[in-house]
Amino acid sequence: MIPKVSKIIPWIKDNKKFLKKTYKGIERESLRIDIDGNISKKPHPIIFGSPLTHNWITTDFSESLLELITPVSNSKKYTINFLNDLHIFIIKNLINENLWPMSMPCKINNDSSIIIAQYGNSKLGRTKTIYRNGLKNRYGAKMQIISGVHYNFSFHKDFWKKYNNFYKIQDKFSSIGYFNLIRNYYRFGWIIPYFFGASPIAHSSFFKGLNTDLIFKKNKFGDIYLPFSTSLRLSEIGYINKVQKKIKLKFNNIEEYVDIVKKAMKTPYLNYKKIELKNNEKNLQINVNLLQKENELYSHVRPKRSLNKNKYKLEDLIYKGIEYIEIRSLDVNPFSPIGIKINQIYFLDIFLIWCILIESPKINDEELRSINENWNRVILYGRNPKIKLINFFKKKEKKLSEILKFILNDLQILVESLAFKKNNKIYQKIFFDLHKMTDNPNKTLSGKLLEESIEYGVERLGLDMSKSHKINIENKKLKVINYQSLIKEAEKSIKEQIVLEKNET
């Protein structure tokens, strides 16, 4: 039986102003491509500042893999407008380049075309590059340039006072509450790739040298896909790898989480020992352990704290508390010029509020297996109308469409209880669209993208979309940041990197 919010509707209505006060931030990744649709071989443009110290514009694995970061805000519109402004600045300053609009990469002629991100000569900068060398040697460079959108989310401290009082929780740092949310996200978060997964297909070059037991199909252009997949990015050919399945996170409490992750960071792994640490004075990885560092842990959601001058200890989660959670299961929305639409933010917020309010029992080994199986089914076969998920609490399986309708109906009850008067029409439209996607899986993002990719091919469709998005972005005006502020931030970041390097000599 899926928990419902109906049991605590009176409390929700009494505390709606605290529930509505949530904070968010977005991290959007996107590959720079040349005019022919190849991955860019140019270094990170200097006009964007230093990727090591810039607050909003950085790089992920590759020099060509941009990461755009919005500051924390309690406003959905501000967040989406800030992300939009960053894209305007990027697009206006790319020379003979564009942004690839999909999660799965553009065509990759060979791995040597993927240049690992560089961060200068400071100890911090060198460590970041060595870490990426390790990722390349462990998982392959192609997997590391799969793009995603990370959604950062938190509640105001006033909410936690009300929440802890209601549930009689003694918790100075709100870790118990955040882990209640995280467990329910693991139980039901597969709803995100069902509706918003957008990587059912990839260019054939991605699959060269890839070993998998999955049975794929090809379109007439040679692109490779799974007919009912929602998100190959989240599958075994993406970020869910067999090695990390050894790390069994249940998110039952903060101490257990930190202990498991620390153990993985200290446990040598035979295959990584074979890679070694150095070859001809080139650092191949930070260490030979299951995880080089916490960031290497590929999970659907993470408890997080903000970096303080690029310093962070895993134990800070215990002694200083969780500041926010990072949702990592969002594919890039290829139909949006900025990789995400505001209706997705509305849904994410209400879904995460629902996750904190419904019952959240501890996860045991048996339920963990069911949870992982449910995610796998939705990721690989989610648009199959016959697909069923495991209802762990009832010890039986139920059709995915029935579970989706149950959750959507409960979310609508929650929205009504929170009385979003200004946004009532927005939520009505969102739920109308989501119910349509439930009844007809082909209307999901993955369904629409697969249909167009089969007709036009990934390469042509991606190029056409990137050109269309560029035109859309170029003609917009900045709304929340002015152009000069972006230039100043870039200049400031370069100076900060220089100071960092000088202080180490």
Curated annotation (Swiss-Prot):
Q: Which GO terms describe its cellular component?
A: cytosol
Entries under Gene3D superfamilies matching the protein: 3.30.590.20
Q: Which GO terms describe its molecular function?
A: ATP binding; glutamate-cysteine ligase activity; metal ion binding
Catalyses: L-cysteine + L-glutamate + ATP = gamma-L-glutamyl-L-cysteine + ADP + phosphate + H(+)
GO biological process terms held by the UniProt record = glutathione biosynthetic process
Task: Tell me the HAMAP family matching this sequence.
Answer: Glu_cys_ligase
Which enzyme type, at the first EC level? ligase
Check the record and name the PANTHER family matching this protein.
GLUTAMATE--CYSTEINE LIGASE
Pfam families linked to this entry: Glu_cys_ligase
Keyword annotations for this protein, in alphabetical order, are: ATP-binding, Glutathione biosynthesis, Ligase, Nucleotide-binding
Report the EC code(s) recorded for this entry.
6.3.2.2
Cross-referenced InterPro entries, in alphabetical order? Gln_synth/guanido_kin_cat_dom, Glu_cys_ligase, Glut_cys_ligase
To which protein family does this belong?
Answer: Belongs to the glutamate--cysteine ligase type 1 family. Type 1 subfamily.
| Gene label | gshA
* UniProt protein name: Glutamate--cysteine ligase
